[in-house]
């Protein structure tokens, strides 16, 4: 592995769109293509490399690779459809969309796919041969028509679309059955529509998916890389009947778009099943009774329940009779019921047996087995690491090792039986520098994992409150790094493999021009010291003195601060997906920010969250009985509600602040700072106005009502998916009652929810390497009822108010 992840400059360039010259390419970071027909050329930029691909005359250039460190460009005749891909550092693979596509636009004159059969199923004749038919159109006569192999083409601009000469002597030519691309029309419900329509049915301009104004939303392009949420184009990321968008009208949150249906049959959707596989989206069995015993309503009927999940709106979902189906990406097949009191329910479908655990079948972007935050590290190069981390250094989620989506690969448990390739956990099957994984982002093939190297001695726990440190000028000279080490100015000068570094000013054994003391005078490129001039996520590196290896990373440890890390428990949470109502007892002290709010001389009545040593966040409605701070006290570090054990802290409330608007949120100032211990650690506050992505897996905790089930009196936890407000406000759920200052979370089937006594408590979401407080438990229609998810105050909307109150007091 002689290359490295792409430099920050290139990453920023990629994120900005790369410009018009690269719009016709699909790019994948960290992917290396094995191509027999290739040419290596010099190029100062990605665009220059693309221009050389377009100008290539010795072969048809279908792809190119750009190596940023040595400004190397490789143009190639093959692409990922015809040649294998490996992972590599410091490379981005660009493939022409036209050669990856198996659909046609218009009459298909530019179709360059690999279909090689006619509509009637006859194999096509090669364009370069003269038997059984002498061709009028050949590669020699029409070199720009893409007449390769025996693939269907349209060299004469035939209005009926691509065709080919046939291998049947009795039939000279016939047309091919090529589906239309979803750029000017849509198949099915438009789940794969990729066009550029950006106005709603009533003519309102669409809001950009990357914008949170005028409407905040949870469909973030970075969290849904498979949904193609580009610009402000109409899309269908959530299983609606057709594409839609948020609008630029502050008074109209969202609206459907007017996309015409394609006239050709849709592409095949893969195998169908008579049993449950994954989420059951391809289930085509005849079960027509829900798990609770209700008979299903016919999909074509509007009684007793009116709905838009009709055969007309979902023509590809086989909504026949009253059979259980999953047309909209729910967690399992379901149906509307014939009981007017029960709108819908899930069905109990027998499993196919060997159900997959691949990431493509998870019901949320965040896998349930999340990266540990407590005491998870690797030794050596991490080949022996068998932890459960599944997050990369940039915060991306790992792809399951048994999955081939979105990245096909050969690092499978069968090929590497001793590498511990379990679930989507970070591993090092090929003796790389540290554990890594393939990512669930189609644009990034793989990344190193967000793991640290084990230290010789354990870090001590601070017993006094502190403020998170910012590295000072003195810190820069220490032989350790903060963050990605861009400001590291230590004197390490060997790579992780022990090879001495080449001096930055030298041109031997490796010539380079991008990272020199002259081009980067502020990057500290002195002598041959390890540095990170490009802000590489993987840390400091250097060119090596090994002529066979251009560069490698250095083994620079993270600096240890005396401050606590918010959102990082010392005890790893269970992260159990079971219910709070019904009981899933947490591991003691694994949610160390959870507090019990009590009356001065009474018991627990509400929850809350420690956000700094002196401050607790809770729900405003918890303080309705008294506005006097002296009426309340806070219990920290507890696991049992009634029997407070060793290490529990009991602190009075000195001040309370209720958010001045209608929001159900309040701040409590403690009479003395909490002592930060293994059992008492604050949660992190979110970025102001941050919106949690739809279906993000988050966690609620509390000592609330459990309806007499197991675990009463012990701190419980549950994993809940966030539900986008657009969905939560549907008539069948909460009917427009949820405001932009609130968020929904829960399982629509019911059974898992916060309840009485959990009010004011935390809803925390895992982000990269810590838990962030995104919600304050506020209200709900009953406890754990079907179709009635819990509602939480959206903390990010009040961060500015929170910080201002804390600063003034």
Curated annotation (Swiss-Prot):
GO terms of molecular function: endopeptidase activity; serine-type endopeptidase activity; signaling receptor binding
Protein family (similarity comment): Belongs to the peptidase S1 family. Plasminogen subfamily.
Compartment(s) of residence: Secreted
GO biological process per UniProt: blood coagulation; fibrinolysis; proteolysis; tissue remodeling
Active site (UniProt): 621 (charge relay system), 664 (charge relay system), 759 (charge relay system)
Inhibition and activation profile: Converted into plasmin by plasminogen activators, both plasminogen and its activator being bound to fibrin. Cannot be activated with streptokinase.
Catalytic activity: Preferential cleavage: Lys-|-Xaa > Arg-|-Xaa, higher selectivity than trypsin. Converts fibrin into soluble products
InterPro entries: Kringle (IPR000001), Kringle-like (IPR013806), Kringle_CS (IPR018056), Kringle_sf (IPR038178), Pan_app (IPR003609), Pept_S1A_plasmin (IPR023317), Peptidase_S1_PA (IPR009003), Peptidase_S1_PA_chymotrypsin (IPR043504)
Name used for this protein in its record: Plasminogen
Subunit and interaction comment: Interacts with CSPG4 and AMOT. Interacts (via the Kringle domains) with HRG; the interaction tethers PLG to the cell surface and enhances its activation. Interacts (via Kringle 4 domain) with ADA; the interaction stimulates PLG activation when in complex with DPP4. Angiostatin: Interacts with ATP5F1A; the interaction inhibits most of the angiogenic effects of angiostatin.
Positions annotated with a glycan in the UniProt record: 268, 308
Extra remark: Plasmin is inactivated by alpha-2-antiplasmin immediately after dissociation from the clot.
Organism: Sus scrofa (Pig)
Domain Peptidase S1: 580-807
Function: Plasmin dissolves the fibrin of blood clots and acts as a proteolytic factor in a variety of other processes including embryonic development, tissue remodeling, tumor invasion, and inflammation. In ovulation, weakens the walls of the Graafian follicle. It activates the urokinase-type plasminogen activator, collagenases and several complement zymogens, such as C1, C4 and C5. Cleavage of fibronectin and laminin leads to cell detachment and apoptosis. Also cleaves fibrin, thrombospondin and von Willebrand factor. Its role in tissue remodeling and tumor invasion may be modulated by CSPG4.
Post-translational modification: N-linked glycan contains N-acetyllactosamine, sialic acid and is core fucosylated. O-linked glycans consist of Gal-GalNAc disaccharide which is modified with up to 2 sialic acid residues (microheterogeneity).
Enzyme Commission number(s) of this protein: 3.4.21.7
Signal peptide bounds: 1-19
Keywords associated with the record: Blood coagulation, Cleavage on pair of basic residues, Disulfide bond, Fibrinolysis, Glycoprotein, Hemostasis, Hydrolase, Kringle, Phosphoprotein, Protease, Repeat, Secreted, Serine protease, Signal, Tissue remodeling, Zymogen
Disulfide partners: 49-73, 53-61, 103-181, 124-164, 152-176, 185-262, 188-316, 206-245, 234-257, 275-352, 296-335, 324-347, 377-454, 398-437, 426-449, 480-559, 501-542, 530-554, 566-684, 576-584, 606-622, 698-765, 728-744, 755-783
Record bears the keyword Membrane: no
Residue numbers bearing the Phosphoserine modification: 596
Lineage of producing organism: Eukaryota, Metazoa, Chordata, Craniata, Vertebrata
Location of the PAN domain: 20-98
């Amino acid at each position: 592995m002689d290359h490295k992840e792409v430099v920050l400059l290139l990453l920023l360039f990629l994120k900005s769109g790369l410009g018009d010259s690269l719009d016709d390419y699909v790019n994948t970071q960290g992917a290396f293509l094995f191509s027999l027909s290739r040419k290596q050329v010099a190029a100062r930029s990605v665009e220059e490399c693309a221009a050389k691909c377009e100008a290539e005359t010795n072969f048809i250039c279908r792809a190119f690779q750009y190596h940023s460190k040595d400004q190397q460009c490789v143009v190639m005749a093959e692409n990922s459809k015809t040649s294998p891909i490996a992972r590599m550092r410091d490379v981005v693979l660009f493939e022409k969309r036209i050669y990856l596509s198996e659909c046609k636009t218009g009459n298909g004159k530019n179709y360059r796919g690999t279909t090689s059969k006619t509509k009637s199923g006859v194999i096509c004749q090669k364009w370069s041969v003269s038997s059984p038919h002498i061709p009028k159109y050949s590669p020699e006569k029409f070199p720009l028509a893409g007449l390769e192999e025996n693939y269907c083409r349209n060299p004469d601009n035939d209005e009926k679309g691509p065709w080919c000469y046939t291998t049947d002597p009795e039939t000279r030519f016939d047309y091919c059955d090529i589906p239309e691309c979803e750029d000017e029309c849509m198949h099915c419900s438009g789940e794969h529509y990729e066009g550029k329509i950006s106005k709603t049915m009533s003519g309102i301009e669409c809001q950009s998916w990357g914008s949170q104004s005028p409407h905040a939303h949870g469909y973030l392009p970075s969290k849904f890389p498979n949904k193609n949420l580009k610009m402000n184009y109409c899309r269908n990321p959530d299983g609606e009947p057709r594409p839609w968008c948020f609008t630029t009208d502050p008074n109209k949150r969202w609206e459907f778009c007017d996309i015409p249906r394609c006239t050709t049959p849709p592409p095949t959707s893969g195998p169908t099943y008579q049993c449950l596989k994954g989420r059951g989206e391809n289930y085509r069995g005849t079960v027509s009774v829900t798990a609770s015993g209700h008979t299903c309503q016919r999909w074509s009927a509007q009684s007793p329940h009116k709905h838009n999940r009709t055969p007309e709106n979902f023509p590809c979902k086989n909504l026949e009779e009253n059979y259980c189906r999953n047309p909209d990406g729910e967690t399992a097949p379901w149906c509307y019921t014939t009981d007017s009191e029960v709108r819908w329910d899930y069905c109990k479908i027998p499993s196919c047996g060997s159900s997959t655990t691949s990431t493509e079948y998870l019901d949320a972007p965040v896998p349930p087995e999340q990266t540990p935050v407590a005491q998870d590290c690797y030794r050596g190069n991490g080949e022996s690491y068998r932890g459960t981390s599944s997050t990369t250094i940039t915060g991306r989620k790992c792809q399951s090792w048994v999955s081939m989506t979105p990245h096909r690969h050969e690092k499978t448990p069968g090929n590497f039986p001793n590498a511990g390739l379990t679930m989507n956990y970070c591993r090092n099957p090929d003796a790389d520098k540290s554990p890594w994984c393939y990512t669930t982002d189609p644009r990034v093939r793989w990344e190193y994992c967000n793991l640290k190297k084990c230290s010789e001695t354990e870090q001590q726990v601070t017993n006094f409150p502190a403020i998170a440190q910012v590295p000072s000028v003195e810190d820069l000279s220490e032989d350790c790094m903060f963050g990605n080490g861009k400001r590291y100015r230590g004197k390490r000068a060997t790579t992780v493999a022990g090879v001495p570094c080449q001096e930055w000013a030298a041109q031997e054994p490796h010539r380079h021009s991008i990272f020199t003391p002259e081009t980067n005078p502020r990057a500290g490129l002195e002598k041959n010291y390890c540095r990170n001039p490009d802000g590489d996520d993987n840390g400091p590196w250097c060119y090596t003195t090994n002529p066979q290896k251009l560069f490698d990373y250095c083994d620079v440890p993270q600096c240890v601060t005396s401050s606590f890390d918010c959102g990082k428990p010392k005890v790893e949470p269970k992260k159990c997906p079971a219910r709070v109502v019904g009981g899933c007892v947490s591991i003691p002290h694994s949610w160390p920010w959870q507090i019990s709010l009590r009356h001065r001389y009474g018991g627990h009545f509400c929850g809350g969250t420690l956000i700094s040593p002196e401050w607790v966040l809770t729900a405003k409605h918890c303080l309705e009985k008294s506005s006097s701070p002296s009426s309340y006290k806070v219990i920290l570090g507890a696991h049992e509600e009634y029997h407070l054990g060793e290490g529990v802290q009991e602190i009075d409330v000195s001040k309370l602040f209720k958010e001045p608007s209608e929001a159900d949120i309040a701040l409590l100032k403690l009479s003395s700072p909490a002592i930060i211990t293994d059992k008492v650690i604050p949660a992190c506050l979110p970025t102001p106005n941050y919106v949690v992505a739809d279906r993000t897996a988050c966690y609620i905790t509390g000592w609330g009502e459990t309806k007499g089930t197991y675990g009463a009196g012990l701190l419980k936890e549950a994993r809940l998916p966030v539900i986008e407000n657009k969905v939560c406000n549907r008539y069948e759920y909460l009917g427009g009652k949820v405001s932009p200052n609130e968020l929904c979370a829960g399982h629509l089937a019911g059974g898992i929810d916060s309840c009485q006594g959990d009010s004011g408590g935390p809803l925390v979401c895992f982000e990269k390497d810590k838990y962030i407080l995104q919600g304050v438990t506020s209200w709900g229609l009953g406890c754990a009822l079907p179709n009635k998810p819990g509602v939480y105050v959206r903390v990010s909307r009040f961060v500015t108010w929170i910080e201002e109150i804390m600063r003034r007091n």
